[in-house]
Swiss-Prot record:
Gene: mutL
Protein name: DNA mismatch repair protein MutL
Compositionally biased tracts (Polar residues): 340-358
Domain of life of the organism encoding this protein: Bacteria
The organism of origin for this protein: Idiomarina loihiensis (strain ATCC BAA-735 / DSM 15497 / L2-TR)
Protein role: This protein is involved in the repair of mismatches in DNA. It is required for dam-dependent methyl-directed DNA mismatch repair. May act as a 'molecular matchmaker', a protein that promotes the formation of a stable complex between two or more DNA-binding proteins in an ATP-dependent manner without itself being part of a final effector complex.
Gene Ontology molecular function: ATP binding; ATP hydrolysis activity; ATP-dependent DNA damage sensor activity; mismatched DNA binding
Family: Belongs to the DNA mismatch repair MutL/HexB family.
PROSITE patterns: DNA_MISMATCH_REPAIR_1
Alphabetical UniProt keywords: DNA damage, DNA repair
Ranges where the record places region Disordered: 340-368, 381-400
Gene Ontology process terms (BP): mismatch repair
């Protein structure tokens, strides 16, 4: 057979075999493109595990009309232009293969509007023909990539896809990992029309810890200790879990190099070697780590999916990570082995916590020296005491006749089952239901805010819902009260176009939230009833030690006459009957 140049369509499908392994591969490539474009908010709509549809909307810089066709061709990119750029890659993508490869095995629509362009344009491409059609479209600033019928023209590839649940779980994992690398970006993940994940932009340390708890679990956020080590051009930061609290599965092992998620053997070996002398049998290292170094020190162009890298100074990188993690673990194990007296529950004074002053570079994720509170609180618990679950009255003694006052000098010892804080003062030991406190405090605040009107937040993309699916005729909707709740909408062609919602409803299912809110208002709900309903969306699934301390302060200041969230425990030596 004679040697000949492969047709472009065939070359693209061969490239797709390397880049597009499954729906999650498509999601990874498209999300990375959006982040490279400067997006701060992404909405992902997935259908049937990604095999039917993958739609990703962002508010990034967009693509001008003249470059839409070029964007769907191979080796076309705005990220590098020379060999020197390839040596200093600062973006997540750089090869210019993703869109061309994806469009060769799917039906692809690319819609984009840069801020400087007056109108939006869309480009279509479908399968092997790769014929690109460009036409006008309606779209806000940013880009939408709509992928339908993945592998429709390659049946052999399609039959290797797993079940819908399995494929979506891979997509979910990709989004969680990327969300850990870009705290400043908001992510909304929907599957078959239902909201599955909502990660608001996390700018503050508190918000970042909330995202960490959402992704890795409240237990990780509670147990993990922060590490921050620098040596010349090398910078290692993130969170480590002490050996005795590490997991049996390796599902929380996240390593990022210059913002890029990695599964690199060199890095994994360094972490395992640092843990091995402390790690109990059948447990594996548990961590979220970020390694930063100059771009010219690392080659990311060694793996089709960019999961692996090659370091120019491999030995130095390995030894730096190994020694810094070993130092951190030595300190953590030393702290775990201490048995501090009850009068020294907190390693930091309140003044030190507020100022952030510490000489320990391996500070706890909660802001206090790692695990001092948990070790001490363990010695305070009677054997019969357990975290309350609904009707735990047989194990917990409540004392309504000796009303527990919020103004007493309570302090947090630890957090159990993600929502119960173990607190004590000079006389008492008790559980504080953080979810109840959080909701009550927010409800009280919302009651006051509703009088003046809530500040709504515009939706990245307006949501349309048929009037037939909403209660009552639109002409009878309580317009003024909806505005007071921060809702902005317009009626257009038998649809309500929702443009703005209050913050606590914006992150979930917008249509469901709008419908329920409208129902409440048409039933003339009182302000306090409305506030309680809105407050339930503000609660968290899990609370860190820092958050527990915050809500303890809020409870003392705002709900000083309420002890409903408390359940008292007997102190050691007291009668537990």
């Amino acid at each position: 057979m004679a040697i000949q140049q492969l047709p472009i369509e065939l070359a693209n499908q061969i490239a797709a075999g390397e880049v597009v392994e499954r729906p999650s591969s498509v999601v990874k490539e498209l999300v990375e493109n959006a982040l490279d474009a400067g997006a701060t908010q992404l909405i992902l709509d997935i259908e049937q595990g990604g095999s039917k549809r993958i739609r990703i909307r962002d508010n990034g810089g967009g693509i001008v009309k003249q470059e839409l066709t070029l964007a769907l061709s191979r080796h076309a990119t705005s990220k590098i232009q020379s060999l020197d750029d390839l040596e200093h890659i600062g973006s997540l993508g750089f090869r210019g293969e993703a869109l061309a490869s994806i469009s060769s095995v799917s039906r692809l629509r690319l819609i984009s509007k840069p801020p400087e362009q007056e109108e939006a344009w869309q480009a279509w491409a479908e399968g092997r023909d790769m014929q690109v059609t460009v036409e006008p479209a309606a779209h806000p600033d940013g880009t939408t990539v709509d992928i339908q019928d993945l592998f429709f023209n390659t049946p052999a590839r399609r039959k290797f896809l797993r079940t819908e649940k399995t494929e979506f779980s891979h997509i979910d994992e990709v989004i969680k990992r990327i969300a850990l690398s870009r705290f400043e970006v908001g992510f909304q993940l929907n599957h078959n029309g239902k909201s599955v994940r909502a990660f608001p932009s996390a700018q503050t340390e508190k918000q970042q810890l909330q995202r960490l708890a959402k992704i890795c679990g409240g237990g990780f956020a509670e147990q993990a200790s922060a590490i921050d080590a620098v040596d010349g051009d090398f910078h290692l930061s993130g969170w480590l879990v002490p050996p005795e609290h590490c997991r049996h599965q390796g599902d929380i092992q996240h390593f990022f190099v210059n913002g890029r998620m990695m599964r690199d053997k060199l890095l994994s070996h360094a972490v395992r070697q640092a843990y091995e002398k402390y790690l109990p049998n059948e447990r594996v290292p548990t961590f979220v780590l970020y390694f930063e170094l100059p771009a010219e020190e690392v080659d990311v162009n060694v793996h089709p999916a960019k999961h692996e890298v090659r370091f120019h100074r491999q030995r130095q990188v390995h030894d730096f990570i190994l020694t810094r993690i070993e130092q951190a673990l030595n300190q953590l194990v030393a702290i775990e082995n201490e048995q501090p007296a009850m009068s020294h529950q907190h390693s930091y004074s309140s003044q030190e916590r507020s100022s952030g002053a510490t000489s320990d570079p391996y500070r706890g994720a909660s802001g206090a020296s790692f695990l001092g509170e948990r070790k001490a609180s363990g010695s305070l618990l009677p054997n019969a005491a357990r975290v309350p679950h609904g009707n735990a009255g047989a194990q917990l003694s409540t004392e309504p006749e000796a009303k527990l006052k919020a103004e007493q000098n309570w302090r947090v010892l630890s957090v159990f089952n993600d929502v119960y804080a173990l607190i004590r003062n000079e006389y008492s030991l008790a559980w504080l239901n953080l979810a109840k406190v959080h909701t009550e405090c927010v409800s009280k605040k919302l009651t006051q805010q509703l009088q003046d009107g809530l500040n709504g937040q515009p939706l990245l993309v307006p949501v349309a819902v048929s009037l037939a699916n909403l209660p009552g005729p639109a002409s009878q909707w309580p317009q003024q009260q909806l505005n007071q709740c921060g809702v902005v909408y317009k009626i257009q062609r038998e649809q309500a176009i929702i443009e703005q919602m209050p913050e606590m409803l914006r992150q979930g299912n917008v249509v469901s939230g709008f419908t329920d809110l409208l129902t409440l208002l048409t039933e003339d709900a009182e302000t306090d009833q409305l506030a309680r309903w809105l407050a339930q969306f503000a609660g968290l699934e899990s609370y860190s030690l820092t958050q527990a301390e915050h809500w303890l302060i809020q409870w003392r200041s705002q709900l000083a006459e309420s002890a409903d969230a408390l359940q008292k425990l007997p102190l050691p030596g007291e009668n537990n009957a």
